[in-house]
Amino acid sequence: MNTVDATVGGVTVPVDTGFIVHNPLNFPNIVALFRTLGVATEDSDMSFAVSARGGAFEYAGGLGPAGIFAQPANLLSPRFWGMLGNILRFNARARGALALPDDVSFGAWLDREGFTGAVRDDHLLPMAAAIWSASTGSILSFPASSLFRFLDAHGLLGVFGRPQWRTVSGGCRSYVSALIRDFGGRVHIGAPVATVTRHGDRTALELGTGDVREYDAVVMATHADRTLAMLRDADDGERDVLNAFRYAPNRAVLHRDPAFMPRRRRAWASWNYVTGASGGYVTYWMNRLQNIEAVDNLFVTLDPPEEPREVLAAFDYEHPQFDADAVGAQKRLGGIQGRNRAWFCGAWCGYGFHEDGLKSAMRVARDFGVTAPWETEPPA
């Protein structure tokens, strides 16, 4: 979560550069949390566009026929019509492959099933790369079944029945403020933990300042690799699980440069995957995603190949890469929870999204006999 105040021409609007959208079907606990906190949300839009090879090939899904045929030449393109037909074939084949072994990668499955050319390079890989903020190369190593289950759960293996997406009114900092407001404990700001060491019946946290504080137990809600780096006395089981997760760095740039959007204005969507000589990147059109009208042309681009004009802010993030090792480690996570007064949670415990982080935290809370106000059954 990271909400930025963007000021343009004397007008300031909140813009999210991390967690942006959710929906009731796939984020039920996030929705329940927002409802409990009284956080207002509003409809969003999850249209998706591809601008390939410097704008030589463009289309947008979710904008109706005008978006699909934003490039009129596509009407007469056998390659384009073949891609559309292969998308339907992919959806059907993927729904039948939800139980594949984890060692079958997405790339190997695509090759085996004959998904090449336009459907692979101009739709499937850009879509998956945009969802997971990953390179198309790393997407090919994802376990196919895990990817298919995610797409199926989010209605992305069908043409109809997709959920209505929502965004937090006023930016996601609204719910963070509400959480802190209602929190009965103490929140320590600017107190980074350097190391965690367990001894006897106590757990010592050494802060970056050198101060040491002792507690009965610790819940580590950080990236898996950072958790392992802090946990100085990790045992073999903890090391086995936490060391299985790799992270890819991403630079998110908030800017106003339309050169990082599709070349044709009709193809502008909420999510835009753009490729050129320098590779591919994702640009989010924040005006459409967050219903921002007071300031136009607000974009967030991940890993732009060059510096955009009118940069308003930039941030460095890291996203987990869900290869076979990571997916396998998730299945072993339960075996190390609380074994030595340490519990682990975070979005890396699921698909890498906010709902996954919250569900993993709820599972940890239940180990302490605590349930969420809205919880009627254990989190899946």
What kind of feature is each model-predicted range?
Residues 191-320:
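Mid-domain catalytic core of redox enzymes
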Residues 10, 54, 208-210:
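Glycine-centered tight beta-turn/hairpin loop motif at sheet-sheet or coil-to-beta transitions
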Residues 1-21:
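Conserved N-terminal glycine-rich FAD pyrophosphate-binding loop of Rossmann-like flavoproteins
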Residues 149-208, 213:
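Helical element adjacent to the flavin cofactor pocket in flavoenzyme catalytic cores
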Residues 3-4, 60-66, 267, 279-380:
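Conserved flavin/dinucleotide-binding core of flavoenzymes
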Residues 14, 42, 186-190, 343:
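General small-molecule cofactor/ligand-binding pocket signal
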Residues 19-36, 175-186:
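N-terminal Rossmann-like dinucleotide/flavin-binding domain of flavoprotein oxidoreductases
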Residues 13, 23-144, 148-149:
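Mobile amphipathic helical/loop "lid" adjacent to a hydrophobic cofactor/ligand pocket
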